[in-house]
Regions:
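A flexible loop/linker signature enriched in serine peptidases of the S9 family
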Residues: 6-36, 51-57, 72-88, 100-109, ...
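Residue-level detector of Asp-centered blade-edge/turn motifs that repeat once per structural unit
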Residues: 64-65, 115-116, 177-178
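Short loop/turn segments that connect beta-strands within beta-propeller blades
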Residues: 41-45, 92-96, 153-157, 197-198
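Hydrophobic, helix-prone linear segments
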Residues: 37-41, 88-92, 113
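A broadly tuned preference for mixed-charge, low-complexity surface segments
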Residues: 1, 44-47, 95-118, 159, ...
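Hydrophobic beta-strand positions that form the internal "hydrophobic ladder"
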Residues: 3, 69, 117-120, 182-183
Length: 198
């Protein structure tokens, strides 16, 4: 048995004699600090780093059988919108192999495993996955804060928009292991509603 930790590594200190700004957000305190994942083995007491590098890495979900981690990585791209890109990876804790699910995805937010571990549910704007969730007139740009649901089959990586024709803005979502249904809250004007998706 083990625990998965999110840990933080402090970035290189700024030289007070040099005005060094990597990007605009570097002016914010703590911007150079990076997050990474580690596994703590309860039997041996050994803490094993799972990720490292320049970009922030975070845990999205753990599969129901505790074999896989759904890992996210964020990085900046300031030359065009969106300025933040998110990648998704599936890490097999049995052999430590990593499978890339999405590389430098645009307009993505979060992701979670299905109860059977064969799919992932991803949240993002209508422009995610090359705009398959867009439901506006040609030439119009959909709102970046209009959160949609997408279902990715892990066998073939095909993605299906689940809420393309659903008007309310998805807020929080959970895929129930009890009944296999997806439950989510969504914002409709000034009201918040709870929905079930099967």
């Amino acid at each position: 048995k083990s625990l998965i930790y999110t840990l933080y590594e402090e970035g290189r200190k700024k030289d007070p004699q040099v005005y060094d700004v990597k990007e605009p957000d570097d002016r914010q305190p703590g911007w150079r600090t990076r997050s990474y994942l580690a596994k703590y083995d309860l039997a041996s007491g050994i803490l094993q780093p799972l990720t490292f590098g320049y970009h922030n890495v975070y845990l999205n979900d753990i599969s129901a059988d505790s074999r896989y981690l759904l890992i996210g990585k964020s990085e900046e791209r300031l030359t065009k919108r969106p300025t933040t890109l998110n990648s998704l990876y599936r890490l097999d804790l049995n052999d430590m192999s990593v499978e890339a699910l999405v590389e430098k995805g645009e307009f993505l937010n979060s992701a979670q495993f299905s109860p059977d571990g064969k799919s992932i549910l991803v949240t993002g704007s209508p422009e995610a996955f090359d705009g398959i969730g867009k439901n506006v007139e040609e030439g119009q740009i959909p709102s970046m804060v209009d959160t949609q649901l997408y279902l990715m089959n892990l066998a073939d990586k095909k993605v299906r928009p689940m809420t393309k024709n659903f008007n309310p803005n998805v807020q929080s979502v959970d895929w129930s292991k009890a009944d296999g249904n997806i439950y989510f809250t969504a914002e409709d004007k000034d009201c918040m509603h709870l929905f079930q998706l099967n």
